[in-house]
Amino acid sequence: MHAERGLGSVLGLLLGALLQGGCDATLPVEPSAGPHQPWVLPESLRAQVKSTLDRYGDQPAAARGADQGSDPAALDPTHAYSRGELIDLAQRRNPATRAAWEQARQAALATGVPRATLLPRLAASVVGGYQRLSTPVTLPFGGTRTLTTDVQAVIPILTVEWLLFDFGERTSALEVTDHLATVARVQFNQAHQQVVFDVNRAFNAGGAAGRKEAAAGRALAAARQVLAAAETRAQRGVGTRIEIAQANTQLAQAQLSLVQAQGESATARVALNAALGTPHGTLIRLRDSAEGLPAATAEGLDQVIARALVQRPDIVAGVAQLQAAQAGERGVAAAFRPKVGLIASLSTGDNQFSFNGGTTFAVPLQQTGVLIGVTLPLYEGGLRDSRLQSARSRILSAQAAVATTRGAAAAEIAAAYEALRSALAAYHAADVLVAAAGVGSAAARTGFEVGVGTLTDAAAADKALLDAENARADARRNAFDAAATLAFVTAGLTAEPP
């Protein structure tokens, strides 16, 4: 008796635990303890994210195959890369191009679905079975007997279904998928151009930072030369401690300028790694670009805008979206019109009979049928009007989007067109400024060394030269950035320098 009670208690506890667990499992998941506290990420979710990033976070495009071999997109730390080489690496490694390519591929594959509906569907099936029928039979001379009939059959069936005519509903669906595939393809092109644009800007920033570093190094050497001259003058009794202090200040300012230029180089390196799709700490050597300044376009602004509008990915995608919406409206209208279809079937086989376990005999069976049907929707409860209004609304929305995109694109092109001209003019002015500042710096430093000038003049002249060289480096960068921007907004950006 005690054993039975103990067993009952254990079973009761187990049942209670199961019920409690079931109730807990059905409780809603709260976002956090309250509106005043943020939601805390569970450790399990952190582990899942880390595992996913380790697996997919830094995988170059060339590493997707089973036989990877050497990675053609690998970086060589001893090689100095040119602009074109970096763009080629970015197009291979940047995950944005891989994602856009897969999306374009998915859109292209989606066109196969409506294409398949234009063709007949062929299906094969097999039906088999066994049946026993027992029937009592009254004999003429009295008494009854049971007649047992066994029937078994295996019948293969071939069926063909073909929608012959639907007033263009399937064709409209095919047009929709074709236009959406066009959208995905031009978005893939836009992703490539965005990568090229990002690499161009990062390369220009790295080049400008390198020139600023070189200018800061020259300014630092000049400051040390001035400090040495001040100390020599003091030793000869013709200088003062004030001059030495001013020279030390100039030296510190030159060192600060060098540190700032090195910081700009580090920032440019991070941006370049982001554009390439490489880890942010990767060291990439840049080839000192000796390429000349980009030239301003000889075309007028109106010509540039007219040429660009027909090839910009966002406008091409907007027009394709509009065409898809128009095809969708035609498909909605056709969906409520009659449909004509054909159904044909062919089956053959043998029915095998036996009575009371006697001799089995077969009866051949063959059936052939062809049916043509017409379906006509009569009443949909307002569904047709609702779907048509929704389709027309999508057309109006797409038309407005095209107009908005066109206006924004024209404004972007005009701004980039003028920015390039201004940047080129600024560079030429900065180049003249550097030449003048260089002459003034050399003269002031020589005058101070021979005692006919002051240290203040020499320091100011050296500072003016450094500022002029930094301004020229920025102006050169701005000119290349403006050229890349104009090429980008006109959909003409390629791997070649703009």
Where are these regions (language model features)?
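Periplasmic alpha-helical coiled-coil/stalk elements that build and connect Gram-negative outer-membrane
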Residues: 24-27, 186, 190-307, 419, ...
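Heptad-repeat amphipathic alpha-helical coiled-coil interaction surface used
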Residues: 104-106, 111-113, 174-176, 181, ...
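A short glycine-centered flexible hinge/capping loop motif at secondary-structure junctions
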Residues: 234-238, 448-452, 489
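Small/polar, glycine/serine/threonine/aspartate-rich low-complexity segments that form flexible
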Residues: 69-79, 125-159, 287-298, 330, ...
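Terminal intrinsically disordered/low-complexity segments used for targeting and assembly
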Residues: 2-89, 139-140, 262-307, 487-498
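Amphipathic alpha-helical coiled-coil scaffold segments and their short linker/junction regions
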Residues: 86-91, 147, 239, 243, ...
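A glycine-/polar-enriched beta->alpha junction
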Residues: 88-98, 105-121, 150, 157-175, ...
